[in-house]
Amino acid sequence: LNKMTSNAKEAVEDSDVIFLTLPAQHHKTVFNFLSDYLSQGQTVVATTGYWAGFRLIDLIKEKGLDKKITFIEANIFPYLSGKIGPAKAHIFNYKRFMPVSAFPSENNEEKCKIVREIYPEYKVFKHVLETNLYPGNPSVHAQIALPAAEFIFEKAREFKFYSEVTHTASKLADAFDEERIKVASYFDCDTTDHLTSAERMYEY
């Protein structure tokens, strides 16, 4: 670890690749804050992407960065982690298969090669439409949380999000998956079902 800092300018200057590792609702705020310090040739990676390229493209152009930086989306965060105590987290597992693409995709060959040097587990997909329509958090998170929301948030001292999934949540996830696969197929995107995707990611 070379440096830890809360100074945005100091964090991004002289960096080849900048990772946005934060919830999607904060992508725009943080990118806007960093934008004044970004320089020619830098690569910004949103992980997890959640359509970040489409959501941020107007801001990228407004800041005059569309010809200056490369924006890349990763389908999912590299680590399966959780809080285990005050100011303490633990990485329980990591992904072995993570779709990634530049936005626009014409930069895929050159720029995705750079991020694959950092995470060889990144697999370059055709474009960000394909990465976003591949299984990931949207395939299961809401489907697991909604049927058990009261239990998770009001009653449970501890809830193992994936291993304690309910039958109702499984049915919702499968139904969502059927719709997602249809949409992906319509746009000629390479995809698979969410269970096969989980096997690829974690090699269970």
What are these regions (language model features)?
Residues 1-14, 55:
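Conserved N-terminal Rossmann-fold NAD(P) cofactor-binding segment
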Residues 8, 48, 75, 104, ...:
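Residues at the C-termini of beta-strands that transition into short coil/loop
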Residues 16-19:
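N-terminal Rossmann-like NAD(P) cofactor-binding module of classical short-chain dehydrogenase/reductase
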Residues 24-85:
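Rossmann-like NAD(P)(H) cofactor-binding subdomain of soluble oxidoreductases
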Residues 78-176:
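Substrate/ligand-engaging "lid" and interaction regions
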Residues 177-204:
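Small-residue-rich helix-loop
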